[in-house]
């Protein structure tokens, strides 16, 4: 079971597309939040949605109207709804008022629930991007200095094999394999080829950008690699 949590404007097309592309089932939950008082255009779109949902075997919508006069009061109402919903939560930020969509996005993130959020081309094109709770968790995580040294070596070398990485960091291959497996769970590393070369993906590169201060406060990985050629460099995990 999954929960759809969205707002809605004057057209139900994007929502129907979301339900179709994510294989919505009747037992799922569909919650639509709209600003109060609801306007006639949105009301008409909701009625059209109800008519189509009844024949498509999608979940019936529950409609919530909320007043938006204060950020914290509005966010509180959003959280009251989100926190009761089963996971994962699915949302599409292409529909309705930007103000409501902003509150929905913030509410979903701070709720710490599992989620996937979609953003589509408002012009009706095929472009769509998405991200989920794993993405946010990877970006917001407090990485240790030692983890950042490892990630920065991968950044500076543009990826390397386990054996070479172990030599650079003066660590056993087993230790690094375990650490890399741990970091891969956050979706920031990939391993390719016969030699299982370890590389940062785009998400990993964003983690590097967000943690530059951690990297710059310690020796650069370039210096680390150079020093390791002549003497031992011990970096405890």
UniProtKB/Swiss-Prot annotation:
Keywords: Antiviral defense, DNA-binding
Record flagged with keyword tRNA-binding: no
GO BP annotation list: defense response to virus
InterPro entries recorded: Csa3 (IPR010163), Csa3_N (IPR054588), WH-like_DNA-bd_sf (IPR036388), WH_DNA-bd_sf (IPR036390)
CDD domains registered for this protein in UniProt: CasRa_I-A (cd09655)
Highest taxon of source: Archaea
GO terms assigned for molecular function: DNA binding
Pfam families membership: Csa3_N, HVO_A0114
Function: CRISPR (clustered regularly interspaced short palindromic repeat) is an adaptive immune system that provides protection against mobile genetic elements (viruses, transposable elements and conjugative plasmids). CRISPR clusters contain spacers, sequences complementary to antecedent mobile elements, and target invading nucleic acids. CRISPR clusters are transcribed and processed into CRISPR RNA (crRNA).
UniProt record similarity statement: Belongs to the CRISPR-associated Csa3 family.
Quaternary structure and partners: Homodimer.
Name recorded for this polypeptide: CRISPR locus-related putative DNA-binding protein Csa3
The organism's taxonomic lineage, starting at the top: Archaea, Thermoproteota, Thermoprotei, Sulfolobales, Sulfolobaceae
């Amino acid at each position: 079971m999954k929960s759809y949590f969205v707002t809605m404007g004057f057209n139900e097309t994007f929502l129907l597309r979301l339900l179709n592309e994510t294989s919505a089932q009747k037992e799922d939950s569909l919650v639509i939040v709209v600003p109060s008082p609801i306007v006639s255009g949105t009301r008409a779109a909701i009625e059209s949605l109800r008519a189509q949902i009844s024949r498509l075997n999608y979940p019936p919508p529950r409609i919530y109207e909320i007043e938006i006069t204060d950020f914290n009061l509005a966010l509180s109402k959003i959280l009251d709804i989100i926190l009761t919903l089963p996971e994962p939560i699915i949302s599409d930020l292409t529909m309705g008022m930007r103000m409501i969509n902003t509150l929905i996005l913030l509410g979903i993130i701070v709720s710490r629930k599992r989620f996937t959020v979609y953003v589509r081309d408002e012009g009706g094109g095929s472009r769509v991007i998405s991200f989920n709770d794993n993405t946010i968790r990877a970006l917001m995580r407090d990485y240790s200095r030692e983890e950042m040294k490892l990630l920065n070596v991968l950044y500076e070398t543009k990826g390397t094999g386990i054996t070479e990485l172990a030599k650079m960091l003066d660590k056993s291959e087993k230790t690094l394999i375990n650490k890399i497996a741990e970091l891969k769970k956050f979706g920031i590393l990939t391993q390719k080829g016969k030699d299982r070369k370890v590389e940062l993906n785009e998400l990993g590169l964003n983690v590097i950008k967000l943690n530059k201060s951690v990297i710059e406060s310690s020796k650069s990985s370039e210096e680390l690699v150079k020093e390791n050629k002549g003497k031992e460099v011990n970096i405890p995990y």
